[in-house]
Amino acid sequence: MIIFKSINKLNKEVNFKADIGFVPTMGALHQGHVSLIKKSQKKCKKTLVSIFVNPAQFNNKEDYKKYPKNIQKDLKLLKNLKVDYVLIPTVKDVYGNKSKKKFKISKSNKILCAKYRPGHFEGVLGVIDQFIKQLEINKIFLGEKDYQQYILIRDFLKKNSNVKTILCKTIRMKNGLAYSSRNKLLNQKSIKGSAWLVSKLKKLFIQLKKDLNNKFIINDFINKNKVFKIEYLELRNKNNLSKKISKKNVKIFIAFYVKGIRLIDNF
């Protein structure tokens, strides 16, 4: 495993003509990241993992400061997985001396997380733009848990590059809660409670697929679980996130707070 702290040095030493899969992360690695890496290793000759906590995608400075970091633990995990290349760039290395460019997203995309986290996805697309401009990657691997992010990056890359986007399924703990770096900020009681809510969400989705227009049970679910402060609970088309849904294309999306920590999920 070769570790690079400079994009320039990485480009000088790595032959990007080879089939290279890219797994962008913000560190605090977990089993969800492991699944992305293994998928890349299966599909590509070489795998590059980045660890970069992108300040441009945080609309809350405290959220940025609190984001869990353990670089040595992350590197140990990546070494055990036999990752080929790891990139740990600085903010200046990624963005240069320019201001962190933020892309505008359309009004139709300002839904779900984009509605409640202004500037977040603009920051995400900004850093992805920098990576694809500076790294000649072939494929990028993204997790299903961050589904809205996947859709936006997929559409952005289709318009602006030849990079192929690979969606990887959500990996869950034994209790059903999706692995997330933010889980590390929760105590066991909060994790158990979150897992309980997600299990109820899964059952709700089964009910809703029988009657997609039943708004009553959605409102009832929110009202009965006010302790979690549900930010949104919506049904969307999995192909484009529109509200034109059918039993074949529907997904359910949720964002909620537990002890001040924001979690998202979907089925």
Question: Where in this protein do the model-derived segments appear?
Answer:
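Nucleotidyltransferase catalytic core that binds NTPs
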Residues: 1-227, 236, 240, 260, ...
